[in-house]
Amino acid sequence: MPRRPLLEFEKPLVELEQQIEQIRQLARDSEVDVSQQLHQLESLAARRRQEIFQGLTPAQKIQVARHPHRPSTLDFIQMFCDDWIELHGDRRGNDDQALVGGVGRLGDQPVLLIGHQKGRDTKENVARNFGMATPGGYRKAMRLMEHADRFRLPILSFIDTPGAYAGLQAEEQGQGEAIAVNLREMFRLRVPVIATVIGEGGSGGALGIGVADRLLMFEHSVYTVASPEACASILWRDAAKAPDAATALRITGVDLLELGVVDEVLEEPSGGNNWAPLEAGQTLRAALERHLGELLALSERELKEGRYRKFRAMGRFVEGNSQNPGKID
């Protein structure tokens, strides 16, 4: 059987994966040398996987971003932080497990790390609320960011959520206010802030920890104002049109880099981060260290002004002159 769950568009790989597993089992159970056959099959599977992933549609990228084995915030933190210490609570009686945070070191640099956290199975997903943070989660994140600002710790945030929790209790506790306060206060932070979309980046739930000097995004991650399913239901009253909505929303890294929303798209291993988590971790760490080195050279004023200009430029619409396309009205 395949080593891990395969997505619908990966089904052409099922037979190859089964053959690879059978040969591995044969090698374990006997002294027959099957290394050459195994290498050939693994090479063929890798080539086919690369061909499949080079032509993914936006709707298929969403499936990759939601893969249950995709590395999470805590997975990445454990990959490059040996001395991670998790901090808890919003000091208002809540400790949301859908949003985690703590202090650690990236190389020799002390940093604050915060991010959404999904579960691996149903039980853990229920405990983590499927990565959908409550107002307490965003207030916890803001408390930790204020702590980082006070002690001059750069902030690394990891975004992976379908959106902020929209339940009745969350609304009663001020979900909109909690996210709005985070947006306002993150613009005032005097330390470098780097946000990375490691999976789903959904709506205000993503933006609540996403006001950053640099916004990075993995190749098969998505970042969107609303889920394609929600968009399709609103516009066409038909969730089955989600693939059309995914294309129209321009949610992929290529689109968002072109629109100036993200600063860098990080390449993923063949088959996505779930196939080679350690390689993905090395890619992310190298990018974070590079961007952090550049930001640490800036003054507090330069950081805040640059962050403000970055977000003010988003969504700007300029109409061209039909008679003279090169002229701006």
UniProtKB/Swiss-Prot annotation:
Keywords: ATP-binding, Cytoplasm, Fatty acid biosynthesis, Fatty acid metabolism, Lipid biosynthesis, Lipid metabolism, Nucleotide-binding, Transferase
SUPFAM superfamilies the record matches: ClpP/crotonase
Domain of life: Bacteria
GO biological process, one term: fatty acid biosynthetic process
Extent of the signal sequence: none
Pfam families, per the entry: ACCA
The reaction(s) this protein catalyses: N(6)-carboxybiotinyl-L-lysyl-[protein] + acetyl-CoA = N(6)-biotinyl-L-lysyl-[protein] + malonyl-CoA
Name of the protein this chain belongs to: Acetyl-coenzyme A carboxylase carboxyl transferase subunit alpha
UniProt-listed PROSITE patterns: COA_CT_CTER
GO cellular component, one term: acetyl-CoA carboxylase complex
Quaternary context: Acetyl-CoA carboxylase is a heterohexamer composed of biotin carboxyl carrier protein (AccB), biotin carboxylase (AccC) and two subunits each of ACCase subunit alpha (AccA) and ACCase subunit beta (AccD).
Subcellular localization(s) per the UniProt record: Cytoplasm
HAMAP family named among the record's database cross-references: AcetylCoA_CT_alpha (MF_00823)
GO molecular function, a single term: ATP binding
Domain CoA carboxyltransferase C-terminal: start-end pairs: 40-294
Function of the molecule: Component of the acetyl coenzyme A carboxylase (ACC) complex. First, biotin carboxylase catalyzes the carboxylation of biotin on its carrier protein (BCCP) and then the CO(2) group is transferred by the carboxyltransferase to acetyl-CoA to form malonyl-CoA.
Coiled-coil intervals: none
Top-level EC class: transferase
